[in-house]
């Protein structure tokens, strides 16, 4: 038995019935009220920033828990104007055995059901408690946006059954006592000022919701998208961009024209806008679009480029007037009348975040005066060294003020860039006059209003950028996150982007301190007295006509496609294979439905689902130019063997398009048909597409032309299945323009990899040919004119079919980009081709011998180079493509052209030696192919060839082996190459003079490199002489000479003695005796330094360039 009541009902019943108000009930009532207040407060504290539009507590009295069905539903209850009910699974759902499950279900109103677009934002808590002692309970909370997609929400594992049914202590009853429990729901309805609170965005349309559209992300261009949107919303900037002359042929290739097109599309399109054309105008390739860059740097490069486009035009200096202010750097002497000052323009201001509380602190720090005194005095002309004041002061502020917050800084302790996530506040409005020079024009307005916050979310190496922007003078805020634009609250603009820590208060749990990973890094302020000018909307009349003429058709086409997508559920899509299309088809089946590119070439129709098929016929006739009386339609279906063939004629003329589609394809979205064109007298008299009378089978015909080396569609035939196959030979010869009595080979195309030869004396029935089957014919013998073609191509349809079933399109890419070769190319190959033949074809393509090509497989997940393909003539192309352990193959193979043949390579080994030319500051890599039976002396010969002017043969040289940056052993010139571990690094040098003539007690040690932790060893170790009684200050001078590191690197190195075996480190002071510390520790010298000198340049670290 179950009953339910709301908070109001229960309180009224207790208060109005005086006879029940004994002391026990008073206590229960007070305890219940206390719990209700506490839970309501817990919920509000968890989401304090959302305004509540309704709250209700509903208690469901369950008196016989063990008798409940597997799924029980509570009475319906109201929260304000909204209706809810509870769905309870006492023994849990199928996925939550051992738990009890509870869900809150929203009941939409009739109006909401009709609109099918609604959202109800709720925060709720469930409490299961003991009816006699409500404090014995278990609770949990959640929040959800109820919508047509999500009608219920809750907990599959709300509580363990043993926690409900068992005593937690001998004197404590279970929560479910004698089968009774109270299941209480506390439901808060929250206002949704933005319309997207907890939205799934599955059916979200930015244009409809906000009036604005986003920008597509090309991979890592979110930083660019956020900046472009912040510039676009400033109407004055947009107006200037439109006024740049771009109507000349040269102008249409410019960045300015691409930006105009981008802005125009943002203004008038209803879908997210692509930036591909814009980045192409920058001269960027696909790699550039996957590189994260600094927004400030990108902004400056873009503005510089636009300024160049504005020279000698009516908008020259327009950007300067918008974005540029002036500041003065000065040094003023305290005791004499002397000042050195320089005024300069600025486009943005970089403000410190670390150690600052807010924007005002940063500005005060920026203009803080530094005193130059003592050893740091300023040298003034004619006055000598003087005490002085040094600083920066602003002389003017621009109408548009970009403030760059320095969220990314270099940490010298950790020797790396880090993100500063400290809390940093910025206001909606501020007055910059306090930071203006006293000598500047004090009448200028310096009040600014916040119009943009550009945000970085994440850490230094894995982040995302988006923007919060105010698009109108008195309008709301919007969040621009790539393709999506949504309304935003002031809290999202300010508090959520201050950074720092915040306290989360999950209901029924302890508070949790969390760190925000999103923080503002650029602020856009507009000067208050210029708002009307800056935000005056750009009208269509202000846009150049050539831009409208160029873009309006594409916008209209995009809108048409968008409308089609939105209305696609109302239409049936028809793919109609015509005789013309079939005659141009050169693959298996009657069309290639598995190839998206080729599928687009099939004639397409879009017809309302409710339309009759008889209404579809005249539409086809008009579009394709066929007479209706000669048209017969056939269903095209997928057979069990995965081929696509005609099945039967369409007889359902009075059925709807949806009904016709469902005859053979109830699950698919596309109706596929074949259109037969037949003379009127061959159609059935009723013209209602009845079955074809005495013609028992409708056969498709293909012809193999040896001259063109193609199989093509050659029409269709209605045949009597009792006729012999030879009966159609004259007609086939006529269609192929062959002599009437030409002997023919005829095959049945069953499926890829299965083509059968047909015996002409057999009937169609005996050959099991029926409607939709495909036959292919060819002359039995090639003609004299075809002999040369046959010798270099396919001499029969069977061989071409065999190739078609095994062909694969392979993309060949160079293994190393810097090779002087074709960047990449495609080849259509037989997957059974052997390795040697594959290399021959590649060699012909590349103009190089086949034995000078080495192939490498491709990882299908990362598209990076995998394993080198062994030089094995038995390996097939199929085995190379499927060589990865992943189930999916890759159609990419990497190649490299070799200086030596692969056969020589089998006898030789590529050996790499790092030659110390000038200490460790100049290391050259020497590579040589050495016979596997050779020795180090052969390798040394390659070094001498590399450095012919060094006269190395007359000098004492050393070659040594290094493993994982640790010295291993010296190698003599007679050391055999085959004895050297391929994983070792070989290092060579001319032996320093001080190591050739050691004094008594001097010794040579190996010096290693590490960074902070000796486990982080790196670099190339080197030999060094340590001397008795020598202080480290002198040792350091010799180390500088030995390494030849520049001062910028050597000055930051920390020197120490390391015992790697016992993990001990002793850092050296200038007065230490180096020799004694090494002997005492039984260790070696080491340099604690960052791994910079050996770091390869990262292509992702390169500066922004706009090459156009």
Curated annotation (Swiss-Prot):
Primary localization class, coarse: nucleus
Active-site residues per Swiss-Prot or TrEMBL entry: 120, 222, 464
Domain USP: 213-528
Localization: Nucleus
Stored SUPFAM superfamilies: Cysteine proteinases, TRAF domain-like
Reaction(s) the record says it catalyses: Thiol-dependent hydrolysis of ester, thioester, amide, peptide and isopeptide bonds formed by the C-terminal Gly of ubiquitin (a 76-residue protein attached to proteins as an intracellular targeting signal)
PROSITE patterns: MATH, USP_1, USP_2, USP_3
Molecular-function GO term, any one: endopeptidase activity
Role noted for this protein: Hydrolase that deubiquitinates target proteins. Cleaves the UBL propeptide in sde2.
Name of this protein: Ubiquitin carboxyl-terminal hydrolase 5
Source organism per UniProt: Schizosaccharomyces pombe (strain 972 / ATCC 24843)
Gene for this chain: ubp5
């Amino acid at each position: 038995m179950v009953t339910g009541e709301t908070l109001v009902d229960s309180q009224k019943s207790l208060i109005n019935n005086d006879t029940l108000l004994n002391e026990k009930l008073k206590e229960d009532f007070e305890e219940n009220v206390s719990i209700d207040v506490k839970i309501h407060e817990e919920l509000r504290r968890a989401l304090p920033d959302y305004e509540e539009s309704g709250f209700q507590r509903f208690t469901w009295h369950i008196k016989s828990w063990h008798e409940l069905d597997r799924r029980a539903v509570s009475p319906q209850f109201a929260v304000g104007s909204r209706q809810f009910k509870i769905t309870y699974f006492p023994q849990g759902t199928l996925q939550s055995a051992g738990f009890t499950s509870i869900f809150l279900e929203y009941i939409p109103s009739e109006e909401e059901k009709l609109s099918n677009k609604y959202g109800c934002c709720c925060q709720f808590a469930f409490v299961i408690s003991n009816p006699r002692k409500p404090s014995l309970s278990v609770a949990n909370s959640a929040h959800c946006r109820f919508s047509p997609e999500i009608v219920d929400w809750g907990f599959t594992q709300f509580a363990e059954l043993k926690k409900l049914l068992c005593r937690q202590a001998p004197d404590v009853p279970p929560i479910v006592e004698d089968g009774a429990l109270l299941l209480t729901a506390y439901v808060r309805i929250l206002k949704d000022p933005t319309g997207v609170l907890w939205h799934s965005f599955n059916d979200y349309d930015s244009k409809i919701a906000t009036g604005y559209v986003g920008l597509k992300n090309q991979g890592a261009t979110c930083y660019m998208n956020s900046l472009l949107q912040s510039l676009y919303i400033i109407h004055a900037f947009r107006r200037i961009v439109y006024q740049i002359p771009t109507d000349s042929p040269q102008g249409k290739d410019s960045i300015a024209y691409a930006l105009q097109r981008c802005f125009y599309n943002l203004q008038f399109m209803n879908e997210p806008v692509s930036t591909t054309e814009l980045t192409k105008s920058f001269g960027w390739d696909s790699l550039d679009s996957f590189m994260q860059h600094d927004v400030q740097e990108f902004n400056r490069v873009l503005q510089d480029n636009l300024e160049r486009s504005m020279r000698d035009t009516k908008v020259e200096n327009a950007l300067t007037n918008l974005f540029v202010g002036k500041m003065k750097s000065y040094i003023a002497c305290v005791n004499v009348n002397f000042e050195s000052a320089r005024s300069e323009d600025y486009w943005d201001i970089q403000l410190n975040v670390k150690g600052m509380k807010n924007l005002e602190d940063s500005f005060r720090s920026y203009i803080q005066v530094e005193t130059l005194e003592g050893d740091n005095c300023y040298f003034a002309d004619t006055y000598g060294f003087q005490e002085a004041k040094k600083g920066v002061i602003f002389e003017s502020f621009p109408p548009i003020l970009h403030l760059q917050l320095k969220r990314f800084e270099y940490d010298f302790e950790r020797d790396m860039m880090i993100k500063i996530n400290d809390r940093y506040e910025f206001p909606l409005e501020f007055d910059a006059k306090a930071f203006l020079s006293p000598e500047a024009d004090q009448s200028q307005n310096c009040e600014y209003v916040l119009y943009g916050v550009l945000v970085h979310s994440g850490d230094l190496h894995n982040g995302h950028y988006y923007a919060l922007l105010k698009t109108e003078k008195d309008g709301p805020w919007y969040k621009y996150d790539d393709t999506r634009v949504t309304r935003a609250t002031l809290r999202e603009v300010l508090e959520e982007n201050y950074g720092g820590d915040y306290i989360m208060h999950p209901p029924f749990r302890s508070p949790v301190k969390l760190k925000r990973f999103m923080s503002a890094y650029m602020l856009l302020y507009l000067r208050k007295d210029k708002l009307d000018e800056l935000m005056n909307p750009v009208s269509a009349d202000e846009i150049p006509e050539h831009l409208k003429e160029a873009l309006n058709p594409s916008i209209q086409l995009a809108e048409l496609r968008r409308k089609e997508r939105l209305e696609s559920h109302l239409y049936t899509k028809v793919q109609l294979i015509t005789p013309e299309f079939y005659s141009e088809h050169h693959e298996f089946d009657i069309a290639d439905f598995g190839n998206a590119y080729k599928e687009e070439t099939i004639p397409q129709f879009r017809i309302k689902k409710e339309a009759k098929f008889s209404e579809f016929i005249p539409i086809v006739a008009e579009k394709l130019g066929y007479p209706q009386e000669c048209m017969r339609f056939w269903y095209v279906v997928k057979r069990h063997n995965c081929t696509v063939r005609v099945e039967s004629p369409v007889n359902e003329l009075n059925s709807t398009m949806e009904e016709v589609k469902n005859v053979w394809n109830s699950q698919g979205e596309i109706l596929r048909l074949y259109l037969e064109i037949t003379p009127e007298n061959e159609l059935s008299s009723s013209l209602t597409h009845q079955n074809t009378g005495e013609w028992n089978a409708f056969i498709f015909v293909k012809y193999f032309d040896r001259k063109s080396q193609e199989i093509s569609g050659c029409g269709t035939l209605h045949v009597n299945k009792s006729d012999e196959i030879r009966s159609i030979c004259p007609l086939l010869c006529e269609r192929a323009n062959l002599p009437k009595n030409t002997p023919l080979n005829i095959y049945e195309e069953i499926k890829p990899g299965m083509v059968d030869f047909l015996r002409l004396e057999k009937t169609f029935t005996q050959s099991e040919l029926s409607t939709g089957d495909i036959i292919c014919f060819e002359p039995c013998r090639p003609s004299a004119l075809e002999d040369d073609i046959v010798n270099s191509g396919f001499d029969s349809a069977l061989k071409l079919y065999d190739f078609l079933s095994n062909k694969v399109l392979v993309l060949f890419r160079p293994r190393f980009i810097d090779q002087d070769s074709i960047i990449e190319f495609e080849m259509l190959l037989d997957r059974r081709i052997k390795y040697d033949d594959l290399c021959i074809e590649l060699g012909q393509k590349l103009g190089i011998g086949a034995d000078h090509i080495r192939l490498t497989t491709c990882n299908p997940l990362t598209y990076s180079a995998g394993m080198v393909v062994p030089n094995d003539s038995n390996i097939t192309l199929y085995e190379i493509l499927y060589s990865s352990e992943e189930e999916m193959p890759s159609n990419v193979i990497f190649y490299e052209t070799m200086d030596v043949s692969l056969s020589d390579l089998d006898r030789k080994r590529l050996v790499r030696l790092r030659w110390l030319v000038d200490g460790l500051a100049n290391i050259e890599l020497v590579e040589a192919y050495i016979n596997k039976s050779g020795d180090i002396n052969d390798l040394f010969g390659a070094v001498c060839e590399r450095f012919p002017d060094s006269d190395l043969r007359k000098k004492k040289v050393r070659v040594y082996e290094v493993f994982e940056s640790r010295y291993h052993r010296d190698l003599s010139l007679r050391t055999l190459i085959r004895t050297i571990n391929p994983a070792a690094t070989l290092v060579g040098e001319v032996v320093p003079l001080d190591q050739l003539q050691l004094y008594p007690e001097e010794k040579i040690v190996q010096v290693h490199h590490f960074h902070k932790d000796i486990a982080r060893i790196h670099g190339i170790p080197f030999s060094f002489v340590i001397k008795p009684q020598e202080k480290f200050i002198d040792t350091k001078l010799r180390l500088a000479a030995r390494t030849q590191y520049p001062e910028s690197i050597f000055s930051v190195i920390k020197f120490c003695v390391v015992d790697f075996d016992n993990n001990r480190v002793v850092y050296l002071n200038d007065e230490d005796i180096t020799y004694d510390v090494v002997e005492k520790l039984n260790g070696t010298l080491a340099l604690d330094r960052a791994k910079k000198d050996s770091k390869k340049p990262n292509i992702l670290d390169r500066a922004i360039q706009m090459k156009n």
